[in-house]
Structures are given as structure tokens and as C-alpha cells.
């Protein structure tokens, strides 16, 4: 992880332009994983170093990058599946005032998302007016801290632990645990900017990629291979207070300070999870009819400041 961060910082320092963005929005997680029985969401903060588009030595070849750190607040969800089973058990309770149930779970998501884009400008009038087609290569390293959000009373869960071995095992999985995710993505990308006047431009960026990697949980010592699709849409306004060009012989530079306001939506759908049990690999596609498909999406509004020369 430290080597990855150091490499990203080095690339940023060597770049002729960079932008810092702060964003705030929502994060949603869906699917039959980690005890989820539906969809849960929370507010998130994002911190990004970015350069959307920079031409190489005045050519039509361009590159861009964005490195984003995300931190969510706590997501909570009741364990409805298991509590439904408990409701049935309560029917046999001679003292119906007692309620035996598994408490809700807390989830907190953090992580790094890094993307590099390279491509060719099919339209390149200047740095404020271009249309580029390229390739996205990236990786995502989030992790999910999860734990039960309350300690059940002896009168509630203890009966089921003592009398239902399967439920006892499931309850043990709801202790504090960390789920690490490492994925790689590659796919086509489009990048454009169009000036509205001398100081304001509108820009957009879209990507659709194949994403593959693994999900690992430390508590149950499990590791799942995952395959899916990633998509991202980013639109915004670009503001610069001045645009001047300075020439010294053959050298020409156009230093700028600028600001951005934008909106970014990204989504990762896990189409298949390969679960290896005792040497036998099972595909999660058999769970699709049960609506247990895993997915993540985020919507973020952001503001940024940057420079270029």
C-alpha cells in the first residue's frame, strides 16, 4: 500500500498540472454479502488529486489521472434474514415478552481508487476545446470494517445460541471483522472540454471498464474472486481568472490557476463471484434468482482548485 501511494505522489509531482478536489456525497452498497439483505447507504467524503487532460509535448496524444481517497460514515442495517428465523423461534417461546434477535450491523467503508487514462484527441483546438478517446487503466483498494452495533441481552440471543447451532455460527460471523477488496479495471474512456467564454468551460468524462479482483474477509478466512463492470460519469464547470501565453524564444507556456465545480457518479456491479470451498469452485451466478447480486455506487458533488503550465 505504501509503495502504491508513493508512486502516485511521484507521478503527481512530475505532472505539469494537477488539481485538488474535495467532494461530499452518498455511497450505497447492495447485495447478499456481509449479512446484507438489501441496500444500505451513507454520506461520504472524498479527497482527490486529478489531472483530467494533458497533451504530451504539444501532440494529440494525452494522458490524465485521478487518485481518490474515500471515507464513509457508518452504515447500519438490521439482519432481517436471520431475524426472520428468530421470529419463527419466538413462536415457541413460553414467555412472548422476550424477543430473541440478532442486532443490526455497522459498516464503514474506506479506500483508495486510482485511475490513469491515455489516448488520442480526435479534436484538439486548444486546451479548452478538445475531444479525446482513450483507455482507462485503474485499481481500487477499499476495505469494509463491519461489526454488530449492539450487544444482545442474555434473554434474547442466548436461547438461540444454545439451541440452534447454525444460528450460533452465523452470529459468530457478525463479530468485528475487516473485508479487503483489491480490483483492477481496464476499458474505453471519453474525455471532452468545450469553452463557453474566455474564462468558463464545461467538461465531461465517461468510462466503462471490465473490473476483476478479489474480496477477502479476515474473520472467516475467506477469499473470493470477483468479476464485474465499472462505469463512471463526471461532468462539471471549469473556471480560470486569466489565460495568458508567455514566449521565450522557442519556449511557450500558459500558466493557469483554475477552479472546478462538478458531479461524479461511479458504479461497480459484481457480475460473478467465484467461491472456492474444499477445492470445489462455485459461481455466485446461481444466487442471481435470489437477488443476491453485490454492487457499489457513489454520487459525489465536488469543488476543486488546480494549476497548469
Where are these regions (language model features)?
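Transmembrane beta-barrel strands of outer-membrane/channel proteins
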Residues: 20-26, 65-71, 135-143, 204-212, ...
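Residues that define the transmembrane beta-barrel architecture of outer-membrane proteins
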Residues: 41-47, 108-114, 131, 180-186, ...
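Predominantly the C-terminal beta-signal and adjacent terminal strand-loop region
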Residues: 228-309
Amino acid at each position: 500500500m505504501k509503495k502504491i501511494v508513493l508512486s502516485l505522489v511521484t507521478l503527481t509531482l512530475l505532472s505539469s498540472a494537477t488539481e485538488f478536489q474535495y467532494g461530499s456525497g452518498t455511497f450505497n452498497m447492495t447485495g447478499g454479502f456481509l449479512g446484507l439483505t438489501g441496500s444500505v447507504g451513507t454520506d461520504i467524503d472524498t479527497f482527490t488529486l486529478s489531472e483530467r487532460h494533458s497533451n504530451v509535448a504539444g501532440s494529440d496524444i494525452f494522458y490524465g489521472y485521478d487518485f481518490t481517497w474515500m471515507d464513509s460514515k457508518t452504515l447500519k442495517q438490521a439482519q432481517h434474514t436471520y431475524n426472520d428465523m428468530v421470529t419463527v423461534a419466538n413462536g415457541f417461546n413460553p414467555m412472548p415478552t422476550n424477543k430473541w434477535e440478532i442486532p443490526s450491523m455497522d459498516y464503514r467503508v474506506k479506500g483508495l481508487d486510482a485511475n490513469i487514462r491515455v489516448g488520442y484527441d480526435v479534436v484538439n483546438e486548444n486546451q479548452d476545446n478538445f475531444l479525446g478517446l482513450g483507455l482507462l487503466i485503474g485499481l481500487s483498494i477499499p476495505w469494509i470494517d463491519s461489526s454488530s452495533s449492539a450487544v444482545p441481552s442474555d434473554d434474547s440471543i442466548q436461547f438461540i445460541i444454545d439451541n440452534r447451532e447454525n444460528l450460533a455460527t452465523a452470529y459468530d460471523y457478525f463479530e468485528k471483522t475487516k473485508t479487503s477488496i483489491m480490483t483492477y479495471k481496464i476499458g474505453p474512456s471519453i474525455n471532452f472540454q468545450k469553452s463557453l467564454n474566455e474564462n468558463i468551460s464545461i467538461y465531461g468524462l465517461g468510462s466503462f471498464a471490465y473490473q476483476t479482483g478479489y474480496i477477502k474477509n479476515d474473520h472467516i478466512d475467506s477469499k473470493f474472486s470477483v468479476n464485474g463492470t465499472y462505469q463512471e460519469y463526471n461532468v462539471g464547470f471549469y473556471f480560470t481568472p486569466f489565460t495568458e501565453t508567455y514566449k521565450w524564444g522557442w519556449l511557450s507556456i500558459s500558466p493557469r490557476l483554475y477552479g472546478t465545480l462538478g458531479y461524479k457518479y461511479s458504479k461497480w456491479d459484481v457480475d460473478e463471484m467465484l467461491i472456492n470451498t474444499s477445492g470445489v469452485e462455485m459461481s455466485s451466478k446461481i444466487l442471481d434468482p435470489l437477488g443476491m447480486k453485490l454492487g457499489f455506487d457513489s454520487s459525489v458533488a465536488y469543488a476543486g482548485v488546480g494549476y497548469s503550465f
